[in-house]
């Protein structure tokens, strides 16, 4: 650990050989980055605990798994910046926060001629911007799961473009605090489109959002976000008209191909565990963006911090700092696939997150746009991971999943029964 802490600067001249300490660090970390797939296979076929094997000198999974993940993502972006000549890389809040921190840490030694920015945007803030006209509200059921909302909670999301009497119009025909189903969601769309949509308020909201976004997207830009359907990037491109290429970890449907925004993904396929389970390790611990006004982005209530996740994030940034301090500009010449560098973290999400004690402290990771389905999905992911290690009979698995859903949505279960 003391050796890793030493500030070992490598000259830019590629002919200068590595010293003993640098070679040792290279063996323990660079080889570590390129052999995760083998560690995963070892656990599958030999019954070994790959996460324990991947820890370096009793480091936590935050250093060995999440640290390598952030390092690999940041190096992927660094290579793309050098190849494509981007003037600016904007990281989208809030799951781009730690990738931004890792990229800036590495760029202190790489010295790429690129600016970085942090754009506060979220599903909740971007949702009203997707309805320039009242007729566009017909796409609302395609943009979010309306059955996870009540009319009251969904009206809260659409408040920036709603008339003063929108609530009264909805309350006259719909129970405001009851979850919507396949029929009532279209009633909500009809009522809000006819009586609740305010075109003037939309114009003002769009003006405020554009005033916030435009200064950040001058010249040839790239954006980074975890994923998954380019909703935010589409809004940004429409409002700013900028030359933007979106970089995301992966997609989970064919929707991004239809949005018209050029994008590149780190993963060629969608991983087994994603969304809330992944994002909680990458999030800025603070408040989500809930909208825009004349002063810029409007923030909501701050999240309750998770000490386990915060410790992993701190350890991960130590890994990035150690790699930057040890190898310097030679990082650009390291030959490894960033996907391999991410494999340990993927394996951790698949098998180790429950044992690590990492839990979702806040059910609403991106404002309120996901309803309360976030916690349900996290519980189901935990159940799936446990069953992968200790398979249960099919009838028991179905009963277990039904019990989780019953605890969060008893009305839907009663309707099905």
Residues of each region from the PLM?
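Long, low-complexity, Lys/Arg-enriched
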Residues: 1-417
């Amino acid at each position: 650990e003391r050796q890793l802490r030493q500030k070992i600067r490598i000259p830019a001249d590629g002919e200068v050989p590595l010293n003993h300490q640098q070679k040792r660090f290279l063996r323990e970390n660079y080889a570590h980055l390129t052999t995760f797939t083998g560690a995963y296979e070892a656990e599958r076929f030999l019954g070994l605990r790959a996460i324990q094997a991947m820890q370096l000198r009793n480091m936590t999974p935050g250093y060995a798994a999440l640290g390598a993940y952030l390092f690999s993502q940041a190096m992927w972006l660094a290579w793309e910046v050098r190849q494509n000549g981007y003037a600016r890389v904007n990281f989208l809040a809030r799951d781009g926060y730690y990738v931004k921190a890792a990229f800036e840490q590495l760029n202190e030694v790489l010295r790429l001629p690129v600016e970085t920015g942090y754009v506060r945007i979220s599903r909740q803030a971007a949702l009203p911007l997707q309805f320039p006209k009242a007729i566009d509200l017909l796409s609302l059921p395609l943009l979010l799961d309306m059955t996870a909302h009540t009319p009251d909670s969904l009206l809260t999301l659409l408040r920036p473009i709603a008339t003063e009497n929108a609530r009264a119009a909805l309350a006259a025909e719909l129970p405001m605090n009851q979850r919507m189903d396949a029929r009532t969601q279209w009633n909500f769309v009809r009522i809000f489109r006819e009586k609740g949509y305010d075109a003037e308020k939309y114009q003002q909201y769009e003006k405020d959002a554009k005033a916030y976004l435009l200064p950040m997207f001058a010249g040839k830009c790239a954006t980074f976000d975890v994923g998954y359907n380019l909703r935010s990037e589409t809004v940004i491109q429409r409002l700013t008209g900028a030359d933007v290429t979106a970089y995301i970890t992966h997609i989970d449907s064919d929707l991004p191909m239809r949005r018209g925004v050029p994008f590149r993904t780190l993963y060629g396929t969608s991983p087994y565990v994603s969304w809330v389970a992944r994002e909680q390790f990458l999030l800025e611990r603070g408040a989500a963006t809930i909208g825009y006004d004349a002063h810029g982005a409007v923030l909501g209530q701050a999240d309750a911090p998770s000490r386990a996740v915060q410790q992993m994030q701190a350890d991960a940034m130590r890994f990035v700092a150690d790699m930057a301090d040890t190898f310097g500009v030679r990082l650009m010449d390291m030959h490894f696939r960033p996907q391999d560098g991410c494999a340990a973290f993927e394996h951790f999400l698949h098998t180790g997150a429950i044992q690590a004690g990492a839990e979702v402290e806040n059910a609403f990771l991106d404002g309120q746009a996901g309803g309360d389905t976030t916690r349900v999905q996290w519980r189901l992911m935990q159940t799936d991971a446990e069953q992968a290690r200790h398979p249960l009979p099919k009838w028991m698995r179905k009963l277990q999943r039904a019990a989780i859903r019953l605890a969060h949505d008893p009305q839907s279960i009663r309707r099905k029964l």
